[in-house]
Design a protein with these regions (language model features):
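Histidine-dependent nucleotide/RNA phosphoesterase domain, centered on the 2H-phosphoesterase fold
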Residues: 1-157
């Protein structure tokens, strides 16, 4: 944990789809996301009639900028959700989706050997989590690892 930024306020979460920055106006930038598109995505998700589901947190791993927990989705529910969301908008994120929970951003540039060495020393323990709701959330881009705010929530089941 001494390699991570200390001021992390962001709640632990699993990002499903990066839509962009919410706006009530016609999009001016590539990462603008209209409220009417959000409303369409909500309708599409409600059509899935999702029941609560289980995910499994597995190993700790590292991106170049962050430490994270892998998420195993045995029934590919996250894939179904992402496919549904992609019907009404183009994601503005990395091409390959890796379900994960970010544990923190690195405070500096660290040698990958050092990071991987530390990860390997950690005990492995898989944990299951129950997903009961989906949240369309947002954050203030000017605040590094600032809070997430809920905009709309869908209760499952």
């Amino acid at each position: 944990s001494d390699l991570l930024i200390k001021s992390n306020q962001r709640q632990y979460h699993i990002t499903l789809f990066v839509c962009g920055f919410l706006t009530s106006h016609h999009p001016n930038f590539d990462d603008d996301f209209e409220i009417k598109t959000l409303n369409h995505q909500i309708e599409l998700l409600q059509q899935l009639r999702l029941e609560p589901f289980e995910l499994e947190m597995t190993q700790i791993d590292s991106f170049s900028s962050a430490l994270f927990l892998h998420i195993h989705d045995q029934n590919n529910i996250l894939g179904k959700i992402r496919k549904q969301l992609a019907q009404s908008s183009t994601e503005i994120a990395a091409v390959d989706y890796c379900p994960h929970i970010t544990l923190g951003l690195y405070s500096d540039t660290w040698a990958s050997d050092l990071v991987l060495q530390r990860i390997q020393k950690l005990p492995r323990k898989n944990m299951k989590i129950q997903v009961n709701q989906l949240t369309f959330g947002y954050y203030k881009a000017q605040i590094l690892q600032g809070l997430l705010y809920p905009y709309h929530q869908i209760q499952l089941g």
